[in-house]
Amino acid sequence: MTDSNDDKTLSVTGKKTLTLKPSGMSQGTVRQDMGRGRTKAVVVETRKRRPMRPEDEKPITPAAPAAPVRAAEPAPAPVQARPPQPTPAPRVHQPGSSQANQRPQQSYQPQRSNDRPRPVVLNHLSPEEMDARRRALAESQARDAQDAIRRAEEEKRRAAEEAIRKAAEAEEAARRAAEEAARQAEAPAAAEPAVAAAPAPVVTEARPTAPRPASPAPAARRPDGAGAPAAARPAPGAGAPAGARGRRDDEGDDDRGAARGGPARGRVVRPEPAKPVTTRPKTDDERRRGKLTITTADVDGEDTGRSRSLSAMRRRQEKFRRSQMQETREKISREVVLPETITIQELSQRMSERAVDVIKFLMKEGQMMKPGDVIDADLAELIAGEFGHTVKRVSESDVELGIFNIADVEGDRVSRPPVVTIMGHVDHGKTSLLDAIRHANVVAGEAGGITQHIGAYQVEQNGQKITFIDTPGHAAFTAMRARGAQATDIAILVVAADDSVMPQTIESINHAKAAGVPIIVAINKIDKHEADPQKVRNQLLQHEVFVESMGGETLDVEVSAKTGKNLDKLLEAVLLQAEILDLKANPNRTAEGTVIEAQLDRGRGSVATVLVQNGTLKPGQIIVAGDVWGRVRALVTDKGDHVKEAGPATPVEVLGLSGTPQAGDKFAVVESESRAREISEYRQRLARDKAAARQSGQRGSLEQMMTQMQSTGIKEFPLVIKGDVQGSIEAIAGALEKLGTDEVRARIVHSGAGGITESDISLAEASNAAIIGFNVRANAQARQFAERQGIEIRYYNIIYDLVDDVKAAMSGLLSPERRETFIGNAEILEVFNITKVGKVAGCRVVEGKVERGAGVRLIRNDVVVHEGKLKTLKRFKDEVSEVPMGQECGMAFENYEDMRVGDVIECFRVEHITRTL
């Protein structure tokens, strides 16, 4: 590249870098108007065509030296023509300028048109170089062929896109014409002024004519067609408006015609009047907008090379058609499920309406609400009806519908084993009898030899299975006995032949009658010498239990758990009673049943002993038990075996629950985790509401609390109870509740199944409570924390000891009993005023005696005036401890001197006696 066109030598300036341009390329810069007086230099490159045939090659005249410089200058305005250039001389066969501009290193050698460049023979090339040249030539030819194929495909694609665009434009024009015709047909009155004003836009004849230059600007049109580089011509749409581009396109056609050696399309170029270029005035927004976007590219129908997509055009047509035909979308009426309470936002979502519309309706009704406000079902039903929807009202309890008490087809029901509950008084041999039946030794594992848990077992007799439920007999386990009676088919009432009917025996009879289950009386301990079975039968008559031997319908069997006598007869009686009851269940359905017992095991987590009453329970199923749910991880029998399924009347331990359910809760299998979570959350809400209502009912206002404390003086003994199973905790809570009196009661701050943890210690510290562990222990961290905080932890494994210790501790909270003992009376004979001592009463003891330090009352006219203690008691001048009746003495009161002659002084002794519950 050189600084001037005259210098043909290859040189590099100090400020420019040496670059090689591809052949056939010319480059220039133009100035693009950016608006508001701003311009930008744009580099434009143009590729020239090569002559494909030797006869098409035209002799090219050299370009004027100043032409490239002027081409690079910015145009003064996009709508004005370039300054007129002198008409170039006729074409003469001169060296081609295009090659000279593109390859400045080649010298310009004049040659005639009939002279052809002779090939240069390179004799000094080696064979390897010749082969490389041939390979390069072959590769170049292959690339040219590929480029030609690519260009052909590109032309085809452009032609197809142009056809699609023209078809869309034709469709749009036809649609607009049809719409215009429809509007004119519908509104003939409005069409008349439009027709009258129609000729007004025709102003082409009134345009001022101006002589057009005979020769256009060289930059716009060149006679030789290749004199100036393409950089002098800016790209379409770069800096000129649409009008100027249209004119230049026409001039381009003339250029192509002139390039073929004559006027364009055989016409003589004559001067034409210059058409005024109409430019649309720019608005402020367009002046500020310097960025070209798709939205702003197609303005007022200008042909900028972009067009809307077919999808956008269809959407636009559909929208316009709706607006013309005034179509309204069909209102969809939906069935809206309304709970007892719902937020406005959720209601609008269920109706598929906007929350704003719902709020507007409420504002019209005079209610100002927000989308997050909660409304009741009545208002929600009114809103849904206003919006044209139907309503289905449900309650929160409907989430439990369809999971319990599902009716079965009679043909699907098959016989199932009976569920037998062993009930009776404590120490009457219930567990020993069950051990003899199961050939096990459960009694040895029970603390104190008494049953404190409810257990479920299954035995087999003559090929038939029997499920036994063992209940505690202690008075504290009333709830356990009630649960056992409700979940059973047959109740075995165990009565000791040497002890006859006892209070828990009567309670068990009442539970069985309340549950409506038949009773089988097992008279135990007949191996003892003092046993009297007939006495037991006679006592049962008092409680409306009529055995068969006494003319009734209740079966009775005399058994001995120690020797195993008549155990087979007892099992036969159970099977006979089960056959009479005709017990059936459907194993081919989802399982449901009752939680017998639940505990928190350290290694296995929450463990629930359940009795399947219907259906079949399998691992992997999702169950809901009370307010907890979980996926069954394993099923364990009473013998410790893992089973794959548990059918009707089968007791198993279930592992995998999210929490520890309450004993006595119903459980059922549900289809999904979402349903289980929904039921669990509903039951948890119910439990929280009940607890809050109970606490609020107990708490009341501060004034009520103070009044109650002053009037009743009830003291509370706070406790934190942790047990091994839920049933034991329930029994302990019930037993402690019975210890309460009008003055003191036990308040259970927290109770739960599982070991004692640090959180229990923190809770006990905050509430100043003692911690009781029943068959559980505290971990090392909890013990250390309790020692640091000074919290007492007591461990028990027998409920007797627990109740006795709590009873003694609660007795200490009772205010001691104040017992007053009369000592004697003295009459005041004279009152003396002694310096430094005060008033001293001279008295005579008229009844009993007077003791120093005892309590005294000053009685005047049979009214107690003062009550206090004696300060001094003297006989003559000596201090004495007591003065008997008939003697005189001097007495002075503490902090009281209003004594008069004739007053009576009563002396008494006060004793405080400790009370017990």
Curated annotation (Swiss-Prot):
Composition bias (Pro residues) maps to 75-89
Query: According to the UniProt entry, which residue ranges have a biased composition of type Low complexity?
Result: 63-74, 90-112, 184-209, 217-244
* UniProt xrefs under PROSITE patterns: G_TR_2 (PS51722), IF2 (PS01176)
Domain tr-type G intervals: 415-582
Molecular function (GO) terms for this protein are: GTP binding; GTPase activity; guanosine tetraphosphate binding; translation initiation factor activity
Instruction: Report residues binding GTP.
Output: 424-431, 470-474, 524-527
Disordered, as annotated region: 1-327
* Record field: compositional bias (Basic and acidic residues): 126-183, 246-258
Q: Chief location of this protein?
A: cytoplasm
Q: Which Pfam families match?
A: EF-G_D2, GTP_EFTU, GTP_EFTU_D2, IF-2, IF2_assoc, IF2_N
Q: Where is this region: G2?
A: 449-453
Region entry G5, spans = 560-562
List the record's Gene Ontology CC terms alphabetically.
Answer: cytosol
Renumbered to this chain, region (G3) spans 470-473
Task: Indicate where this protein resides in the cell.
Answer: Cytoplasm
Task: Specify where the region named G4 lies, as residue ranges.
Answer: 524-527
Keywords assigned by UniProt? Cytoplasm, GTP-binding, Initiation factor, Nucleotide-binding, Protein biosynthesis
Q: Which domain of life is it from?
A: Bacteria
What are the boundaries of the region G1?
Answer: 424-431
Q: Quote the function comment for this protein.
A: One of the essential components for the initiation of protein synthesis. Protects formylmethionyl-tRNA from spontaneous hydrolysis and promotes its binding to the 30S ribosomal subunits. Also involved in the hydrolysis of GTP during the formation of the 70S ribosomal complex.
What family classification does the UniProt entry report for this protein?
Answer: Belongs to the TRAFAC class translation factor GTPase superfamily. Classic translation factor GTPase family. IF-2 subfamily.
List the PANTHER family hit by this protein, alphabetically: TR-TYPE G DOMAIN-CONTAINING PROTEIN, TRANSLATION INITIATION FACTOR IF-2-RELATED
Q: What is this protein called?
A: Translation initiation factor IF-2
Organism annotation: Rhizobium etli (strain CIAT 652)
Q: Which gene encodes it?
A: infB
